[in-house]
Design a protein with these regions (language model features):
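A general structural motif
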Residues: 9-10, 36-39, 72, 111, ...
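Core catalytic region of metal-dependent phosphoesterases/phosphodiesterases
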Residues: 16, 21-111, 209-211, 216, ...
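Beta-strand-turn-beta hairpins that frame and shape the catalytic cleft
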Residues: 3-14, 106-116, 185-188, 257-263
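Proline-aspartate-enriched helix->loop->beta-strand connector
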Residues: 38, 185-195, 233-247
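Active-site-proximal loop/helix segment associated with metal-binding centers of metalloenzymes
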Residues: 112-226
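Residue-level marker for buried hydrophobic side chains located in beta-strands
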Residues: 13-15, 42-43, 189, 246
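Catalytic metal-binding/acid-base residues of hydrolase active sites
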Residues: 19-20, 47-48, 81-84, 120-121, ...
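Binuclear metal-dependent phosphoesterase catalytic core
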Residues: 109-110, 230-238, 250-275
Length: 275
């Protein structure tokens, strides 16, 4: 079932690229550099949850809360590959002014409804200490890390780590059915990666270097994009009036209008207002 987040007081919505744990800088940019007020900022993954103990994030929230309250702003975090999925259940991080939402959540604002779907394959996973034991045991086949519908996964540890098995995106048919039958329209989509027709700016030489140690990486990355393609196809099938699709992950900027949808890749800390 899709979780709905309503922000009826919001007068604008912006989407931000990867922040990689720079929570204080994000709020400073929002409230001081950009002077945002009455704004919902959605972070398109790689937020940085999971690299520290849980109480660390509570401390950060309490530190930035006064600025968010004074400016009447909110932060919505979407899951990236450099995030512990356990934080993105809609409950673990659920402050009044910031929240880490589960996949296929719908952010409802006077500016439109935004569908949030996280996840991606870490291209640098072989260099992550938490990944290497699985690799050497021969368990790095991408299918093991994909979340099939109806799959009841074991609880993900909240202990600090640098990589998590359930990092990839998944297509949730039941969530899309829920949105469709509820009569909710989607005007914008925020994901961590884009559909296959979108730019990914991954240098071939870099991929070749990574594949030497991680041979299943290209296939896993391809499946990620195919998952986004399936999401796009379902949105079109249900006739959602999608105008914007924004994503991060690649640490570069790019944008293009394709078949009536404005696709935007955001670099780290780059913010774009939805209009």
């Amino acid at each position: 079932m899709t979780r709905i987040y309503e922000f009826q007081e919001a007068k604008s919505v912006a989407v931000c690229g990867d922040i990689h744990g720079k929570f204080d800088e994000l709020v400073y940019r929002m409230t001081t550099l950009c002077g945002m007020t009455d704004t919902v900022v959605i972070v398109a993954g790689d937020c940085g949850f999971g690299f520290h103990k849980r109480d660390y994030y509570d401390q950060v929230y309490n530190r930035v809360l006064p600025k968010l309250e004074k400016s009447n702003c909110w932060v919505v975090f979407v899951r990236g590959n450099h995030d512990n999925p356990a934080y993105f259940d809609g409950e673990t991080v659920s402050g009044k002014r910031w929240m880490a939402v589960d996949d296929y959540s719908l952010v409802v604002t006077p500016c439109g409804n935004i569908l949030c779907v996280g996840g991606a394959t870490s291209v640098d996973r072989y260099n992550r200490e938490s990944y290497r034991p699985l690799f050497h045991l021969g368990k790095n086949e991408g299918v093991l890390y994909r979340k099939p519908i109806g799959y009841i996964e074991e609880p993900v540890s909240m202990d600090p780590a640098d990589w998590w098995p359930m990092e990839t995106p998944y297509f949730d048919e039941s969530a899309m059915e829920s949105i469709h039958h509820a009569g909710r329209s989607v005007q914008a989509v925020v994901t961590h990666i884009g559909p296959s027709m979108c730019e990914d700016v991954m240098p071939p030489t870099w991929i070749d270097y990574l594949v030497e140690n991680d041979p299943t990486l290209p296939a896993d990355m391809r499946r990620d994009r195919e998952t986004m393609d399936a999401l796009l196809a379902r949105l079109r099938r249900d006739c959602h009036p999608v105008r914007h699709w924004l994503y991060g992950h690649y640490h570069h900027s790019w944008q293009s209008d394709i078949n009536g949808i404005g696709y935007t890749m955001l670099r780290e800390m780059e913010m774009k207002e939805l209009r």
